[in-house]
Amino acid sequence: MTIELKPGGLLIAIEGIDGAGKTTLARRLATTLDAAGARVVLSKEPTNGPWGTQLRQSAATGRLSAEEEAELLIRDRHEHVDTLIAPALARGDIVILDRYFPSMVAYQGAAGLPLDELLERNAFAPRPDVLLLLDLPPPTGLARIRARGDAPNHFETQDNLERCRTIFAALDLPGKHVVDASADADSVLRQAHAIIVAALADRLSGDAHTDTGKAALELLSGGRPA
């Protein structure tokens, strides 16, 4: 059974400081929802496009100013929205993003740019229907980064991650859910999966109370997290 959503789909953004487990959760959610019959598009920011590639290179060197990084992020996001996010939502797909504009607000805000201006510059970007904020103490995130063999970049200092965590917590956006990312990966997945199934109830192409809608919800909620 293919699970059909209404036009507009469902936009899920997974956010949090470095080391919180965003990429792992995004991939496992995509696998779980796909196995249940949903059409899923998995993407990330920065993207692999020219602006995103330049940003990742700068993260290793720290040579760009916060304003220069913000400008590249906006260019990257415009392209991402136009070429992938908006078309997928129009088809009624579930779009899962490993980072989105809240990361720009948190990280560039932690670098000193005004939060209200950062939000205003992202007004063009579709707002997530579900914003999963993976909350984690920075020392734990840094320990995870080192455990996987990576050297922390210039963003990944405890002081900077503390500032980012504070901004993430203060963001007042619809659809925001805080998930304890210090729990094991399976527990985090179960929490996130339950939140998404609840959000999907009114997005199904068949009403959730019809036989088709009930069957779709049963598949989604009964699908074992991968």
Swiss-Prot record:
GO molecular function, one term: ATP binding
GO biological process: dTDP biosynthetic process; dTTP biosynthetic process; dUDP biosynthetic process
Matches recorded under PANTHER family: THYMIDYLATE KINASE, UMP-CMP KINASE 2, MITOCHONDRIAL
Designated gene of the protein: tmk
Stored InterPro entries: P-loop_NTPase, Thymidylate_kin-like_dom, Thymidylate_kinase
Highest classification ranks of the organism: Bacteria, Pseudomonadati, Pseudomonadota, Gammaproteobacteria, Lysobacterales
Keywords, comma-separated and alphabetical: ATP-binding, Kinase, Nucleotide biosynthesis, Nucleotide-binding, Transferase
Entry's Gene Ontology cellular component terms: cytosol
E.C. numbers: 2.7.4.9
UniProt function note: Phosphorylation of dTMP to form dTDP in both de novo and salvage pathways of dTTP synthesis.
Protein name (database record): Thymidylate kinase
Family stated for the protein in its record: Belongs to the thymidylate kinase family.
Superkingdom of this protein's organism: Bacteria
Alphabetized CDD domains for the sequence: TMPK
Sites where the protein binds ATP: G16, I17, D18, G19, A20, G21, K22, T23
Catalytic activity: dTMP + ATP = dTDP + ADP
A Pfam match: Thymidylate_kin
